[in-house]
């Protein structure tokens, strides 16, 4: 899953990247996916539920797709690098998901843990 806002950020840096180009299955809007805690449940459409398990680690294939793009997917942070190329999760409940469906996040109880890089 990738947040749609990332594509605008990348375009501003000169990269022509559209939804689906980076291999994501779902593109969201209005959710800062990479900042959600581990174990967050995302409800998509009427019945699908995904549990967030980690951050997508940018691999060398991203640079093969667009030269220099891999480095743009990494932000420096005091706790170490943070990846911004989406999140990974496991399906907890299946269901039909179509473009335009709502996505709702349910975060776990505190204390929260950051999504690990996978």
Where are the language model's segments positioned?
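Metal-cofactor-dependent catalytic cores
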Residues: 1-118
């Amino acid at each position: 899953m990738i947040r749609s806002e990332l594509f605008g950020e990348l375009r501003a840096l000169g990269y022509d990247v559209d939804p689906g180009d980076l291999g994501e299955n779902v593109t969201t809007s209005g959710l800062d996916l990479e900042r959600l805690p581990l174990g967050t449940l995302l409800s998509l459409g009427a019945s699908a539920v995904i549990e967030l398990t980690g951050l997508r680690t940018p691999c060398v294939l991203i640079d093969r797709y667009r030269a220099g793009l891999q480095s743009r997917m990494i932000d420096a942070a005091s706790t170490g690098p943070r990846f911004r190329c989406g999140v990974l999760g496991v399906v907890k409940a299946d269901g039909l998901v179509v473009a335009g469906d709502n996505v709702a996040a349910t975060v776990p109880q505190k204390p929260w843990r950051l999504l690990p890089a996978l």
